[in-house]
Amino acid sequence: MMLADMKYDWNQNEGRTLVDGYSRGVAVGEKIMMAHVKLDEGAITKPHSHDYEEIIYVVSGRWRVEFGERVFILEANQSVVIPPFVEHSSVAEADVLAVVATNYRPEWANNQDYWLHYNAENHLWAV
C-alpha cells in the first residue's frame, strides 16, 4: 500500500451504489477495512454468516439487526459486534449512515456482495 492510499475523505468519496438504497465506500488496508455505509429506509440484508467478525457503528438513523430471534435496534452512537459464523440479517428502519469495521474482505473491496442486499421478488429493496 502506498502512503497516498492511506487517507480517505468520505466527503469526497460518496461510495458506490450496489443496489437501489444501498451505497458503500471502503477504506482498505492489507488486513482490515472500514466501510462508510448509507442505507435508505427499508433496505435489507439477507440472512448470512461469515468467518470473520464485524463491528457496526451507527452514525445516524435506525438499523434493526437480527440474530435469529434476538434483535438489536441500533440508533446514533450505538454499536453491535457480530461474531464469526453467527447468522444475521438487517433492515433499515429509517435512513442509516453507519461505519462497519471488519477484516479485509475481497468481495467488499471489489463490490461483489450486492446479492446480499437485493430482493429478487421485487427487484427493489424490501419495504
Give names to the regions the model predicted:
Residues 19-20, 35-49:
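Conserved short histidine dyad/triad with adjacent acidic residue
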Residues 84-109:
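Ligand-binding loop in jelly-roll beta-barrel domains
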Residues 46-53, 86:
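Histidine-centered catalytic micro-motifs
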Residues 59-60, 75-76, 94:
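A cytosolic small-molecule/anion-sensing beta-strand core signal
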Residues 69-84:
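Short acidic-glycine-tyrosine-enriched beta hairpin
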Residues 1-31, 115-127:
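A short, N-terminal "cap"/entry segment at the start of jelly-roll beta-barrel domains
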Residues 38-40, 50-65:
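Short, conserved beta-strand element in jelly-roll/cupin
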